[in-house]
């Protein structure tokens, strides 16, 4: 296993996750801001590790495996925490939609890789926009300094859910022939 700066950034993101959860539950007034800040630092490493791996030609198989796992674990845990905090359908429904999509697409990618057609379900631009909307919405819903930030966060969460469904349809459409053939 080769460790380089992009891989270390990904590992750092994984290490931040338990601290993020712990800070979220601290019974102090600054915990929402601190949890959102930790989440944002982790989210930035998600972008930065991939950028550096491509820029410095330091892509590794381990990094290619760990990066999406770290991203999905971070986002899923953030969604669970936000859902638990708000106790409302307007947060739970988009979160459940996005988590279900991640499970479906992960299974689809694995299955397509077994068929030797992994590239036909590669990450699309809509997936990148979805991830950005998710990260911003989650950061605002974690921070929640005032009601307007929460409203914008919830609206962005719904935008992310719609983009999630759209990107899932793109992936399923790209794999349609193989899905129907088997």
Curated annotation (Swiss-Prot):
GO MF term list: CDP-diacylglycerol-glycerol-3-phosphate 3-phosphatidyltransferase activity
GO BP terms, alphabetized: phosphatidylglycerol biosynthetic process
Alphabetized Pfam families for the sequence: CDP-OH_P_transf
Compartments (UniProt record): Cell inner membrane
Main location: membrane
UniProt-listed InterPro entries: CDP-alcohol_PTase-I, CDP-OH_P_trans, CDP-OH_PTrfase_TM_dom, CDP_ALCOHOL_P_TRANSF_CS, PGP_synthase_bac, Phosphatidylglycerol_P_synth
Enzyme class: transferase
The enzyme's E.C. designation: 2.7.8.5
Catalytic activity: a CDP-1,2-diacyl-sn-glycerol + sn-glycerol 3-phosphate = a 1,2-diacyl-sn-glycero-3-phospho-(1'-sn-glycero-3'-phosphate) + CMP + H(+)
UniProt-recorded name of the protein: CDP-diacylglycerol--glycerol-3-phosphate 3-phosphatidyltransferase
Organism whose genome encodes this protein: Shigella flexneri
Gene name of this polypeptide: pgsA
